UniProtKB/Swiss-Prot annotation:
Job description of the protein: Core component of nucleosome. Nucleosomes wrap and compact DNA into chromatin, limiting DNA accessibility to the cellular machineries which require DNA as a template. Histones thereby play a central role in transcription regulation, DNA repair, DNA replication and chromosomal stability. DNA accessibility is regulated via a complex set of post-translational modifications of histones, also called histone code, and nucleosome remodeling.
S-S pairs: none
Lineage top rank: taxon: Eukaryota
Cross-referenced InterPro entries: Histone-fold (IPR009072), Histone_H2A/H2B/H3 (IPR007125), Histone_H3/CENP-A (IPR000164)
Annotated source species: Guillardia theta
Location(s), subcellular: Nucleomorph; Chromosome
Protein name: Histone H3
Length: 136
């Protein structure tokens, strides 16, 4: 029998799981196979779990090497060939993470005050303005 070329066909819409189950039902060798349903948590459950996890820990949230590269890149603007002790970079990282966490706490309070649960740039601007920081 001669081989023939097959042309590409578009699939007709519909749920992929229903099409798979129909194919399995038609085939002879897979009579009693059930598709396992993917487990999903309710929206917000994983977020709350992450919040609890990070509130318990005292670890740094930003990775050390990317932060170190950022510090060196910013220092190049002021003076070239600057060298940093490891403890100096660690102190900068501790201070910057503390600042960011406090800023996000204040930002979250601003969003809650506006009867929202999602923070927006205007919340950050308001938090910084209340703190008395300069906004560029």
């Amino acid at each position: 029998m001669a081989r023939t070329k097959q042309t590409a066909r578009k699939t007709v819409g519909g749920d992929i799981n229903s099409r798979i189950s129909e194919k399995r039902a038609k085939s002879d060798n897979s009579k009693n196979i059930d598709l396992k349903k993917v487990h999903r948590y309710k929206p917000g459950t994983v977020a709350l779990r992450e919040i609890r996890k990070y509130q318990k820990s005292t670890n740094l949230l930003i990775r050390k090497l990317p932060f170190q590269r950022l510090v060196r890149e910013l220092a190049q603007d002021y003076k070239s060939d600057l060298r940093f002790q490891n403890s100096a970079v660690l102190a900068l990282q501790e201070a910057s993470e503390s600042y960011l966490v406090n800023l996000f706490e204040d930002t979250n309070l601003c969003a809650i005050h506006a009867k929202r649960v999602t923070i927006m740039p205007k919340d950050i601007y308001l938090a910084r303005r209340i703190r008395g920081e300069m906004i560029f």
